[in-house]
Amino acid sequence: MNKKTIWITGGSTGIGKSLAIKFANEGWNVAISARREELLNQISEKYENISSFPLDVTDKLKCKEIFNQIRNKYESIDICFFSTG
C-alpha cells in the first residue's frame, strides 16, 4: 500500500509547520511549500518523509509547476492544506 501524501503551503512556520510534523510522524509523505527556503530546508532535513518545495503562492505558474513536481514525486496528492498568509 502506498503512503498518502499531503501538500502544505505555509509549511515553514506556525500551523503549517505543526501539521507537517504531525503528518510526518504519522507516516505520511509531506510536501511543504513557503517562500523562505532556508526554513523549509531546516524542517525537511529533520524528517525523512518531508520534502520542501519553495514557492510564492501569488505566482500562479509556479504553483502549477510545484503541484506537478509533487505529483510526479509521489504519484498523487491526497490532501492539499493551504495555510498561507
State where each predicted segment sits.
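The beta1-alpha1 cofactor-binding region of Rossmann-like NAD(H)/NADP(H)-dependent oxidoreductases
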Residues: 55-65
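Conserved glycine-rich Rossmann-like NAD(P)H-binding loop of the short-chain dehydrogenase/reductase
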Residues: 26-43
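Conserved NAD(P)H cofactor-binding loop of Rossmann-fold oxidoreductase domains
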Residues: 83-85
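Aromatic pocket-lining residues of Rossmann-like dinucleotide-binding sites
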Residues: 23
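Conserved hydrophobic beta-strands of the Rossmann-like cofactor-binding core
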Residues: 5-8, 80-81
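Conserved glycine-rich cofactor-binding loop
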Residues: 10-14
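A conserved hydrophobic alpha-helix of the Rossmann-fold in NAD(P)-dependent oxidoreductases
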Residues: 40, 63-70
